[in-house]
Curated annotation (Swiss-Prot):
Modified residues (N-acetylserine): S2
The protein's role, per its UniProt record: Scaffold protein in the commander complex that is essential for endosomal recycling of transmembrane cargos; the commander complex is composed of the CCC subcomplex and the retriever subcomplex. May modulate activity of cullin-RING E3 ubiquitin ligase (CRL) complexes. Negatively regulates cell proliferation. Negatively regulates cell cycle G2/M phase transition probably by transactivating p21/CDKN1A through the p53/TP53-independent signaling pathway. Involved in kidney proximal tubule morphogenesis. Down-regulates activation of NF-kappa-B.
Coiled-coil positions: none
Location in the cell: Nucleus; Cytoplasm
GO CC annotation, single: nucleus
Protein's UniProt name: COMM domain-containing protein 5
Organism annotation: Mus musculus
Every COMM domain range: 151-215
Source taxonomy: Eukaryota, Metazoa, Chordata, Craniata, Vertebrata
Keyword Acetylation listed: yes
Family (UniProt): Belongs to the COMM domain-containing protein 5 family.
Length: 224
């Protein structure tokens, strides 16, 4: 059996048809979250709190490599288990913090963690970070980190047909040439077949549709 154990059961979808609840974990938890839920069952609370401190430090952009090594040695955790614990806890908090407190209620947050099988005392520690006094500071750090990333300033594309090429299989095969310009001044050019471009259009349209549906559900939830 793997050291990570079997995946924990997950009992609801992004929106529970019975409760109208919006899941902060999405349609199903990521592999990192599922794995950490299994390992937390065998972790003592003292070690978990030290782990949380490291994760919060990482969210603030601190270099925690030495502290991670010290925790692994003092808690007798293998590199594999420690990596899973850190990645899963980091992902869990990030997913909770990306939603405003008005959209994610403490009770719903704790219910989802209970369904994953996370121990109750650890759920309390996670909830205190997601909804406690440190939340405004974590939100501020996340905003600063997000604003430092370049954004798309311009997007251009055109259809190109190669009439003559060294690769005969590409002869007369249309493709789409795209160019992205970012706010940091960099430009990226790439070429994709028409079929892949259509897949991209469909995927973007689907994501936008799901985002709009989620926003409407959150608005209805707040109005109720």
């Amino acid at each position: 059996m793997s050291a990570l154990g079997a995946p924990a059961p997950y009992l609801h979808h992004p929106t529970d048809s019975h409760s109208g609840r919006v899941s902060f974990l999405g349609s199903q938890p990521s592999a990192e979250v599922t794995a950490v839920a299994q390992l937390l069952k065998d972790l003592d609370r003292s070690t978990f709190r030290k782990l949380l401190k490291l994760v919060v430090g990482a969210l603030h952009g601190k270099d925690c490599r030495e502290a991670v090594q010290h925790l692994g040695a003092s808690a007798n955790l293998s590199e594999e288990r420690l990596a899973v614990l850190l990645a899963g806890t980091h992902t869990l908090l990030q997913q909770a913090l990306r939603l405003p407190p008005a959209s994610l209620k403490p009770d719903a947050f704790q219910d989802e963690l209970q369904e994953l099988g996370i121990p109750q005392d650890m759920i309390g520690d996670l909830a205190s970070l997601a909804f406690g006094s440190q939340r405004p500071l974590l939100d501020s750090v996340a905003q600063q980190q997000g604003s430092s990333l370049p954004r798309v300033s311009n997007f251009r594309w055109r259809v190109d047909v190669a009439i003559s090429t060294s690769a005969q299989s590409r002869s007369l095969q249309p493709s789409v040439l795209m160019q992205l310009k970012l706010t940091d001044g960099s430009a990226h050019r790439f070429e994709v077949p028409i079929a892949k471009f259509q897949e991209l259009r469909y995927s973007v349209a689907l994501v936008l549709k799901e985002m709009a549906e989620l926003e409407r559900k959150c608005e209805r939830k707040l109005q109720d």
